């Protein structure tokens, strides 16, 4: 009989003995999971690497190590035998528990991963990690682990299940923002319901804010939120939710700001399956949980309905009011994210003028900073707006369901007295129109950045149309509604006009025409017909504006005569074989001809007169990312302006109203029109 299988165990014992003078006897800590990703990258017992590893682990588990922050890094040896390691303790545990957990994990490391150069060990109270590579200040997704309760949520009502997932997802994502903006990169949150929901998120403190947030968001997406509890580990971050307090609430009380309490009033409870048995070794511990789902905030919805009814009696308008759709019940999705007005008022310094970021069609936008350091954009709807209450409800309903890097994220809302406020993530670089239409700012966006922005907008619209759980038509895509993040990443904003489509719905009609002049498709402006192809038309206009730095609403000259608006002007350049004359002079000497030409071609396909001729957003994304895809020949665009002032102006002359009444010119977002 071979005794080869005993070698790792004997090595583990001898290694543990060599560290025993450095560590006092410790309690047992339950091993949740481990990762030894490579069987190729190994070392031998007599190697320099093993000597360096012992030095590293002795340093990390030493009583002289600093456990006050719950995080420590160390390096031992020189390349190519250098070892880098770290430990991360859960943010609420004491120094003593942290020290003991690290010492315990050091003793166990060779039991779980003998001879491996790259190792991650996960325990409930701590994580130990080391590698032959530099792992400091770097996000790592290899070596992940997921632990889920074995029982699904038991409910015959799918809406209740979805509402539970929305509650957990939205609260975890809000906690992720708080953690990313804190120095400790740790945050807990307790949602007050009849049976409380507890959440915890944490990153290694050496990560940047952006890396921490991205890591946590990825971990949240990695969990199946149909279970009644679970957790997800990456070497760089972790997230967890339960219905019982699994962390030290006293130690974390300061991390949960009293200014952001959930305001939902649950009306029903969800029946849950009984929890399974807990496995202690190797398989991880399942969560024994019973979770309550917050169901619609009936009072809040009734408040909206009552308010709409009163205004309908008081105010007569020249258009037919559309009833709120069935999706209005979903405003409760964001119920757990309702903000307290006093907290928002304090964050914006009582809506101080110096904090004002801008003004939109329905109100003003302010920058706010909460005591935790989180920066937000606060959209305060005007109290005198005759239309804002509808858009407020619509925006909460729509945006609360969306999570995509190319969409501005809704953090919460406030509805107190006559105040209607939306709280968004803060996007520092203003909107796209601030750059492309300003002669002094245009040079900051070279072609590489503009091409990236075009791709980001396309992916964001594709998510709305196809990849999200809902099919959403934005209806107000324009340069002013594209915000730019830290890395000039495009984020679509302002969902006040958006409409949700049913599963098999492809188009809809409305007598309430809303939008911005120059971006609206012909069939929408004339007949109130809108579909995904309406957004495609707007996207095409946006692409032409990004390439040219010109507004579509202006009239341009060609050969000494009027060439019409930007769409018509581009079509004439294309027909004459000189489309590159459209390029913004600020980057004319530094761009890829094939990329610009292809983008102009795609834009002309998007603004074709007939909706069925326009490509879908999925096709557009493929066209942008795959140069080998052949492009169709574009047909004449909608709203085509002829060169002679005596000739008809295409579709525009069929409208029974003047274009000045059709809609505003770029700086406002709403118009009411009654077509024939």
Curated annotation (Swiss-Prot):
The chain crosses the membrane at residues 288-308. It comes from the Eukaryota. Induction: By salicylic acid (SA) or by a bacterial pathogen infection. The modification Phosphotyrosine is found at residues 424, 524. It is a single-pass membrane protein. GO terms for molecular function: ATP binding; protein serine kinase activity; protein serine/threonine kinase activity. The modification Phosphothreonine is found at residue 516. It is found in: Membrane. The active site is at residue 476. CDD domains: Gnk2-like, STKc_IRAK. Glycans are attached at residues 33, 46, 64, 152, 181, 243, 248, 286. Residues 351-631 form the Protein kinase domain. Its EC number is 2.7.11.-. Keywords: ATP-binding, Glycoprotein, Kinase, Membrane, Nucleotide-binding, Phosphoprotein, Receptor, Repeat, Serine/threonine-protein kinase, Signal, Transferase, Transmembrane, Transmembrane helix. Residues 31-135, 146-246 form the Gnk2-homologous domain. GO terms for cellular component: membrane. ATP binds at residues 357-365, 379. It catalyses: L-seryl-[protein] + ATP = O-phospho-L-seryl-[protein] + ADP + H(+); L-threonyl-[protein] + ATP = O-phospho-L-threonyl-[protein] + ADP + H(+). Residues 309-676 are cytoplasmic. Its main location: membrane. Residues 252-279 are annotated as: Disordered. Residues 1-16 form the signal peptide. Belongs to the protein kinase superfamily. Ser/Thr protein kinase family. CRK subfamily. PANTHER family: CYSTEINE-RICH RECEPTOR-LIKE PROTEIN KINASE 13-RELATED, RECEPTOR-LIKE SERINE/THREONINE-PROTEIN KINASE SD1-8. This is Cysteine-rich receptor-like protein kinase 4. It comes from Arabidopsis thaliana (Mouse-ear cress). The gene is CRK4.
